[in-house]
């Protein structure tokens, strides 16, 4: 079982950088995650374990409510190394100041651990525990 991720993109749309990053994530996380087709931020999301932002843009400031409305873990994985790019800290910091939690791994090992945690989370939602 793999983690199911839905990539989202901002109102300014997808560009070549977004598409390159998405393909890099698919390659890096091929064993850990199934990455769906991208969805515009604010559009209905398919069933998934988390959303992933492969690219952070200034649009985040104007689309704050659409980000807040996401009822799944929000991953910020914006570098080709499977981590958060250093210049995205400002947007992430702003989101945090507005009460919006994000997960931004700082190395590929941590990213892969997050994928496994998402897999376990889904498994446990369907599990039944017997308590004596």
Regions found by a protein language model. Name each.
Residues 1-132:
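An N-terminal assembly and electron-transfer interface module characteristic of large anaerobic redox
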